[in-house]
Regions:
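Arginine/glycine-rich "motif VI" loop of SF2 helicases in the C-terminal RecA-like domain
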Residues: 208, 235-242
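Non-catalytic interaction/clamp surfaces of large macromolecular machines
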Residues: 20-64
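Amphipathic helical hotspot of TIR/SEFIR-family domains
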Residues: 227-234
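C-terminal or mid-to-C-terminal helical accessory/interaction module adjacent to the motor/catalytic core
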Residues: 241-277
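Conserved P-loop/Walker A NTP-binding site and adjacent catalytic elements of P-loop NTPases
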Residues: 1
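A glycine-rich phosphate-binding loop feature that marks nucleotide/adenosyl-phosphate handling sites
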Residues: 50-57, 234, 247-257
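Acidic beta-strand-to-loop metal/phosphate-binding motif
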Residues: 173-175, 214-225, 247-248
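Phosphate-handling DNA/RNA-contact segment within nucleic-acid enzymes
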Residues: 13-34, 74-216, 230
Length: 277
């Protein structure tokens, strides 16, 4: 108040090194995002991904809003493209974009629709990838960046940076499990939805929401795991001072399936009749 500058605590060498690493990883992730977007719009394989997205009701506007792209099925498309932009193999491994195998490094994400995951400031800190074609090896349907210092799911809510304005306006957030659920809700106009990315809703996520909303509506999957997760999530959200309601999607469907089948108004009706947690 008196204009006296408080000296900042000197950062240790280790802290400075961590900051530098985080900046490099985020820069690599931003480059990867742009590469995946280019693959979606400028390759034959991208047309497959566009057809898949269109089939799920995801419009070009939503693709743009969430910076959705596609990872080519080749073993080193990203490694090669980002290598030319000055990203070392070590950096791409550290960022979780490449994996070192005995045969050499390979892209971690291959043949997947790519969804960048941003922190509240809009930095890309990781990715979710949804398989485009189930193959004989039955690779996992979803693959995420592994947990690191800068990609800690407890401190992130998927879609928060794009939903924030609408959440503040409505004083309410709708919380779903997966990023595809959140994207489908945005696609039909429920653009105050965010995803906790899995069923374990965390205190850090509740605090993030409490800064923007008064009330949260949990819309987890109707299966047993989703119901158990809802019970835990309700108490965590209440501890953060949030009003809580629970939305049950009929017919055991997840929000993504329901909203694609029945549309926005039917889902708004479910929000309106959601019971207090």
């Amino acid at each position: 108040k008196l204009g006296i500058a408080v000296p900042e605590k000197e950062k240790t060498k280790a802290e400075l090194e961590r900051e530098k690493q985080a900046k490099q990883v985020i820069a690599a992730n931003e480059l990867a995002t742009r590469f995946f977007q280019a693959c979606l719009t400028k390759t034959d394989y991208g047309i497959k991904a566009q057809d898949y997205l269109a089939g799920r009701g995801i419009t070009p506007e939503i693709i743009e809003r969430f910076s959705i792209g596609v990872a080519l099925p080749n073993y080193n498309a990203l490694l090669s493209a980002l290598g030319k932009r000055g990203c070392s193999v070590g950096l791409l491994v550290q960022a979780g974009l490449a994996v070192n195998y005995d045969r050499g490094p390979m892209d971690k994400f291959r043949g997947r629709v790519m969804i960048p995951i941003q922190d509240p400031r809009g930095h890309v800190v990781g990715f979710g990838g949804r398989i485009l074609e189930q193959n004989a090896q039955q690779t996992a349907k979803y693959m995420n960046t592994g947990e690191t210092e800068w990609f800690n799911k407890r401190t992130l809510l998927f879609g928060m940076n794009v939903a924030l304005k609408e959440i503040k306006k409505r004083h309410q957030a709708v919380i779903v499990e997966g990023y595809m659920d959140a994207i489908s809700l945005h696609a039909c106009g429920i653009d105050w939805a965010v995803a906790s990315m899995g069923t374990a809703f965390a205190q850090e996520q509740a605090k993030l929401l409490a800064r923007a909303a008064d009330e949260v509506v949990f819309s987890y999957d109707s299966d047993a795991a989703g119901q158990r997760a809802t019970v835990r999530a309700v108490s965590i959200a209440k501890e953060a001072g949030l009003k809580v309601r629970v939305l049950v999607v009929p017919d055991g469907k997840d929000p993504d399936e329901f909203v694609r089948k029945h549309g926005k108004d039917a889902y708004l009706q479910l929000i309106a009749t959601a019971v207090s947690g």
